[in-house]
């Protein structure tokens, strides 16, 4: 009664309904324009990073002195999921992941409280703290500074001109500086002169520190005015620093008496090279969590344009990575597909209905339903991305279905009875099928509930897709019984109408087939179930995967060399690699390689680890057909570089892999234990085992040994005899090698560290280090070798920990087979061939974890959804057998999807699972339409056989229209090769394949099966 009242109200108040529709279009358009746009939904976890630096410390010292104390404080935080860390030379990165229910600001407050309590107990000189509020996908914009200025000047320009301006943009978390040289004022002492004059490193450090600060002395009043008194003691230039006095036993000396003061660079932990030409400086814009990427990048371009007049002559800012380009391509793919689908659907409507007015009446629901979806997307704080817009592409056919049923029925009633008033005829026709339409849409919505329950990365990725579908369907639900009856009353005519050529042709084919199936019900039903069982037996032979790889366009070539490589050797190697690629691969537009660590410490790499960003010219200009061929061509150009590990990834893919497991790769095998040597040996064995498995690609384990360490162990008794303290010894050695930072002073717009450091060639020879001598308190030069033991040892590049345990990781990508079967085989091979020592254990991580979690969730929730739909069908038809008969569409729909996946070599993935869910809804909806009409005819007093034959023929058009519209809506996805189409293609394959078998069941098997049931039970 309520549905009939809504229809009646809409037809009586047509002006109000039309005004409401116009308002929906207006607010929908507004929401579409003002909703943020991004490539993907925000899939990042609630994550807090702590970056701490202690210059000159080895990985083991960083682990023992910083990471372990922090772990004791940070483990067991409320809502914490995991705590992992990596310690390298001079720096540690601690990452804490929280449950998604924990607010990021609350998480940071919790971490900050614990961090503050432990920081005071950490060694003197520890720098850093919590990283900015960024996510693993915050790298949205990268550029280099090129031109005829020095690398120090480039870095100064980036750090103190460009970076402050870009950080002012709303949504920018920070701008990371990579490469170049950071300027420092360096005091270069002559140790012989210092010994002769009786000056120690501590004396020099104290004198410099005192003289680098101005201070205030108070206020002075004169004639009613106040003057603030400032004592100008700070030395702010090289000349001023040279004039600083140092007190000694021989009197007061100037620094320039025993040292030079020069402008040099600080010790570097990394560098950036470009196109094989030389070094450059890179800027990396990081976005805040939940920020509008497109808007940020637009403002970044505007700000860079404003800065152009202030750049030195001949200097340019060159962008080599812009996330918005990928976003625009992905959105363009979905938009193009959406437009193509709408065009195909409108053509299909006209072919089936043969009436332009009826086609218009149906087509009205599309812009209105999409507008409703955009309004809810905006209200839900979602973004317009590949998944949310992709959901609308998937839903496009389903949005039309209910309108098709309403208009088609009204069209039939008006054509059959021209004597009844048009409004009354439309009211009766809409009332007749209102329950079926509403229950059909509700059924489809219920089928998408399982997607809304997904957890983890797969939930964040696919929930927006399901949400946009549900929003659009809710719009359709209301519009089908309000605006569609009104539009039908305005555009349809009460005139007789003959069938179109297409429907006559289809009826001629269908009628004899239907007769055969109805006359031989038992034989055809038996044959159908044999087909069903045979088709379902394909399931074990269809591979399983989490998600198809998405082509981002640009690639990242990861390069890993021997851990002991020096900075200069690493730089020369990368320049040679870039030159080789540029020489042999003409499709490469630019190469930017970054080696080592960045300024913020968000991307810790050793001097042996390089991420090489490679951009290509337009694909139409390539000499090869596919991207895989192009990547093979790049690897072929590098065949002369022996002993180096090369592997390919993509900018976003790389960060997602790191986010999931802390490393890159489809599969990550984590080995936990205490001894680094044992972990290294086990990693090597597992890597060899994985290489023997079919489908393994780019199997790598981190080269975690082979770094040369020079252990200097002071003899405290010997030092006491000559009057040298441990603190003085440490400061001396640090000043002789890396440099001892004393303070930071303002120099114009920049801030420059002042440090004590010996000539750089001291660090170039172990012999020279052994010959170093420091001044005792008696003014005597004491060789280091006489008071300390110096030995060369091998040590780790880094120490990785997870949940307070050391670990090593072996990673592998998978090509040519599905991920699920590869992981199962890998587990079996490792269990058979790798013997673990006591207290050592292995875990597996990577993309397959998401798939397993999704499968587990869906295997629980989908049966519950089917049960819910059974109850909806039962309350609709008041019959358990009829409800079960309609649900029989589901397994037959599955068979078509499985056959289609098997035929084209696609895997069962989360997108394919979404396709099956969409398919279930369409299949059940068709069953509802068919069985509902059979029941209606039966209640009119017709015989069972007459009901089946007449009803099936009359419902041929709506069933085929529904299937064709749903299929054609997805057809553009099947043939699209644009950015982002890889994710949607498995879904389209499943739906198109399943529509064939489910439509065949609806049209050919449901009639005889209904006939058998109706003859045995009474249908009310």
Regions found by a protein language model. Give the residues of each.
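Solvent-exposed, non-transmembrane alpha-helical starts
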Residues: 19, 58-65, 101-110, 139-142, ...
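Solvent-exposed, membrane-proximal periplasmic/extracellular interface segments of envelope transport
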Residues: 62-133, 192-213, 234, 568-663, ...
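Extracytoplasmic/periplasmic membrane-proximal domains and adjacent transmembrane bundles
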Residues: 9, 40, 51-53, 119, ...
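Signature of alpha-helical transmembrane segments and their immediate interfacial
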Residues: 2-37, 431-433, 499-548, 588, ...
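Transmembrane alpha-helices and their membrane-interface boundaries in multi-pass membrane transporters
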Residues: 396-410, 433-453, 460-498, 612, ...
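Hydrophobic transmembrane alpha-helices and their membrane-interface caps
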Residues: 28-33, 343-412, 453, 471, ...
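Transmembrane helices with small-residue packing motifs
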Residues: 15, 22-61, 117-123, 451-461, ...
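Helix-loop junctions and hydrophobic alpha-helical segments within the transmembrane domains
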Residues: 320, 327, 331, 407, ...
């Amino acid at each position: 009664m309520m549905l009939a009242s809504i229809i009646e109200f809409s037809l009586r108040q047509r002006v109000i309904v039309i005004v409401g529709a116009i308002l929906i279009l207006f607010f929908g358009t507004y929401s579409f324009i003002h909703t943020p746009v991004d490539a993907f939904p925000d899939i990042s976890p609630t994550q807090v990073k702590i970056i701490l630096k202690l210059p000159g410390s080895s990985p083991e010292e960083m682990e023992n002195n910083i990471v372990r104390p922090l772990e004791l404080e940070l483990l067991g935080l409320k809502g914490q999921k995991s705590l992992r860390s990596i310690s390298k030379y001079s720096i540690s990165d601690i990452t804490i992941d929280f449950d998604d229910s924990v607010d990021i600001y609350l998480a940071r407050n919790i971490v900050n409280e614990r961090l503050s309590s432990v920081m005071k107990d950490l060694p003197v000189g520890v720098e850093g703290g919590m990283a900015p509020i960024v996510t693993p996908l915050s790298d949205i914009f990268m550029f280099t500074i090129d031109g005829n200025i020095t690398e120090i000047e480039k870095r100064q320009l980036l750090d103190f001109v460009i970076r402050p301006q870009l950080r002012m943009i709303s949504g920018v978390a920070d701008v990371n500086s990579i490469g170049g040289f950071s300027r420092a004022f360096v005091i270069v002492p002559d140790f012989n002169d210092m010994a002769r004059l009786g000056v120690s490193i501590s004396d020099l450090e104290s004198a410099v520190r005192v003289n680098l600060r101005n201070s205030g002395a108070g206020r002075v009043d004169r004639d009613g005015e106040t003057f603030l008194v400032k004592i100008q003691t700070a030395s702010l230039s090289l000349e001023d620093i040279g004039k600083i006095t140092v007190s000694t036993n021989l009197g007061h000396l100037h620094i320039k008496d025993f040292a030079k003061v020069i402008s040099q660079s600080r010790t570097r932990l990394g560098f950036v090279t470009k196109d094989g030409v030389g070094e450059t400086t890179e800027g990396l814009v990081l976005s805040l969590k939940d920020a509008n990427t497109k808007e940020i990048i637009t403002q970044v371009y505007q700000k860079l344009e404003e800065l152009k007049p202030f750049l030195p002559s001949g200097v340019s800012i060159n962008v080599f990575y812009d996330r918005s380009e990928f976003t625009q391509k992905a959105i363009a793919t979905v938009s193009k597909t959406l437009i193509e689908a709408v065009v195909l659907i409108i053509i299909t409507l006209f072919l089936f209905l043969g009436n332009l007015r009826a086609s218009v009446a149906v087509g009205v629901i599309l812009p209105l339903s999409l507008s409703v979806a955009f309004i809810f997307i905006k209200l839900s704080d979602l973004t317009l991305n590949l998944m949310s817009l992709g959901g609308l592409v998937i839903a496009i056919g389903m949005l039309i279905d209910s309108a098709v049923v309403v208009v088609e029925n009204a069209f039939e009633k008006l054509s059959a009875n021209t004597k009844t008033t048009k409004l009354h005829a439309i009211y009766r026709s809409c009332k007749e099928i209102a329950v079926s339409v509403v229950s059909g849409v509700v059924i489809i919505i219920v089928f998408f509930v399982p997607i809304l329950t997904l957890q983890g990365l797969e939930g964040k990725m696919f929930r927006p897709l399901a949400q946009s579908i549900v929003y659009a369907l809710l719009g359709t639900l209301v519009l089908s019984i309000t605006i569609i009856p009104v539009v039908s009353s305005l555009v349809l005519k009460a005139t007789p109408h003959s069938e179109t050529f297409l429907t006559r042709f289809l009826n001629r084919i269908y009628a004899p087939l239907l007769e055969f199936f109805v006359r031989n019900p038992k034989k055809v039903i038996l044959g159908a179930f044999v087909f069903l069982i045979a088709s379902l037996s394909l399931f074990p032979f269809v591979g399983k995967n989490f998600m198809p790889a998405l082509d981002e366009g640009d690639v990242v070539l990861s390069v890993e060399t021997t851990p002991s490589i020096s900075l200069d050797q690493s730089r020369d190697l990368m320049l040679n690699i870039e030159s080789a690629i540029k020489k042999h691969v003409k499709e490469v537009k630019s190469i930017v390689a970054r080696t080592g660590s960045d300024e913020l410490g968000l991307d810790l790499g050793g001097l042996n680890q390089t991420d090489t960003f490679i951009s290509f010219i337009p694909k139409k200009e390539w000499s090869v057909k596919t991207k895989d061929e192009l990547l093979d061509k790049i690897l072929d150009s590098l065949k002369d570089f022996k002993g180096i590990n090369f592997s390919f990834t993509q900018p976003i893919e790389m960060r997602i892999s790191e986010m999931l497991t802390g490393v890159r790769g489809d599969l990550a095998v984590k080995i936990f234990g205490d001894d680094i040597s044992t972990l290294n040996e086990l990693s090597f064995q597992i890597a060899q085992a994985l290489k023997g498995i079919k489908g393994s690609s780019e199997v790598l384990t981190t080269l975690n040994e082979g770094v040369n360490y020079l252990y200097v162990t002071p003899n405290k008794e010997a030092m006491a005899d000559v009057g040298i303290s441990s603190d003085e010894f440490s400061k001396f050695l640090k000043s002789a090698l890396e440099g001892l930072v004393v303070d930071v002073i303002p120099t114009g717009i920049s801030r420059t560290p002042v440090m004590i450091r010996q000539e750089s060639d001291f660090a170039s020879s172990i012999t020279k280090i052994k010959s170093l001598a420091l001044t005792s308190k008696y003014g005597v030069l004491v060789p280091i070798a006489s008071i300390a033991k110096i030995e060369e040892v091998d040590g780790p590049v880094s120490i990785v920990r997870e949940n307070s345990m050391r670990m090593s990781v072996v990673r592998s990508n998978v090509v040519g087979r599905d991920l699920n079967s590869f992981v199962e085989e890998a587990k079996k091979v490792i269990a058979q061939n790798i013997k673990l020592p006591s207290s050592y254990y292995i875990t597996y991580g990577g993309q397959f974890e998401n798939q397993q979690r999704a499968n587990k969730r869906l295997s629980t929730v989908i049966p519950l959804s089917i049960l819910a739909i059974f109850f909806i069908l039962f309350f609709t038809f008041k019959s358990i057998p009829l409800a079960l008969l309609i649900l029989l569409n589901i397994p037959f729909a599955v068979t078509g999807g499985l056959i289609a996946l098997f035929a084209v070599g696609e895997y069962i993935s989360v997108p394919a699972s979404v396709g099956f869910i969409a398919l279930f809804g369409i299949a059940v909806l068709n069953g509802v339409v068919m069985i509902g009409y059979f029941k209606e005819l039966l209640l009119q007093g017709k015989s069972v056989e007459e009901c089946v034959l007449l009803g099936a023929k009359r419902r041929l058009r709506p069933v085929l229209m529904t299937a064709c519209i749903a299929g054609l809506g997805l057809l553009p996805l099947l043939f699209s090769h644009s950015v982002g189409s890889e994710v949607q293609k498995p879904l389209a394959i499943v739906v198109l394949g399943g529509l064939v078998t489910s439509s065949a069941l609806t049209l050919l098997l449901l009639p005889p099966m209904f006939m058998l049931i109706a003859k045995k039970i009474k249908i009310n």
